[in-house]
Amino acid sequence: MRVLNLSSNDYANYAHDNARALRAIGVDCRDATINAHPFGYVTQSQVVTANQIITTYKQYDCIQIFHSDTNLYNLVKDHPNIVVYHTGTRFRQQSEFYRNAFPNAKHATDQCEFLINYPDLFYIAPHTELKPVEKAKDGKLIIGHYPSNSDVKGTKQIKEMLMPFDNDFDIRIDTRQLLHKDNLARVAECHIYVELFATEQNGKPYGCFGTSAFEATALGCLVITNNINEKAYTDVYGHQSFLTPNTVKAFQNTIFGLADRDTFDMTVEAMHTGFYSKHGIIETGQRIKQIIER
């Protein structure tokens, strides 16, 4: 089987990681993009032109299009086996349009909230190959928040909610955009990583963890994020490894409960159980293969 992954802009390196997971289980998968990623990932999709896609796509058994991209779909729409991934703002803001913009395609997502209105979407969580990094054992627990987009991730409200705990934790919030490897290094120092607090985006339901939640968990952080549709995750993967307070009161109660280091240590152990076996590259490749072969 030969698979071609296509993106115009590969947000969170998602199409590339998807291809790597397929290659890990022996699937011949090539990933290509129109534009290089600005975060400078160590590896990412090969940059190609639209003409190169047009002249080669029929050589593949399946075409996977990422981030609800109608322009790419129009280049390959006569292919008999197309999978479209809906991953973020584009689909969230115009879901009805994008749900119907890809006739005869199969549809997948990594966003739990999309399954509230579209339960037929095939859910695939990200994978990670990162390993736990030992945290400082002395001093205050470090809470970090390093958003890719501070408006989208709810940074202003996160700052306000954490203010009462300034004496109890070493709170580090930084909105500077770093190269991916440098961002991972600062995340790895944190005991607790706050990824997100935003249950709406421009009036539309939001509140679902992203790739950074999986990266931070793999690095050994206790992740606090949102998920307004936990069932979408638990139906496929079982126990969820993130804390997901979806109200201000629940968020602050969560932080208050973690101030005691013994409580924190027990919570990390309980929350991280089974994470690595569910979200490894092999397990994710096998999950992706299921929708390709549908």
Features from the language model and the residues they span:
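Short hydrophobic beta-strand element within catalytic cores of glycosyltransferases
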Residues: 218, 222-226
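Acidic anion/phosphate-binding donor-loop and adjacent secondary structure
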Residues: 94, 116-140
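A charged, aromatic-enriched C-terminal amphipathic alpha-helix characteristic of glycosyltransferases
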Residues: 13, 262-293
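Conserved donor-binding/catalytic core segment of Leloir-type glycosyltransferases
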Residues: 4, 132-153, 159
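Short alpha-helical segment that forms part of, or immediately flanks, the ligand-binding pocket
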Residues: 184, 210-218
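Nucleotide-sugar-dependent
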Residues: 196-213, 225-236
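Extended catalytic core of nucleotide-activated donor transferases of GT-like folds
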Residues: 33-105, 109, 113
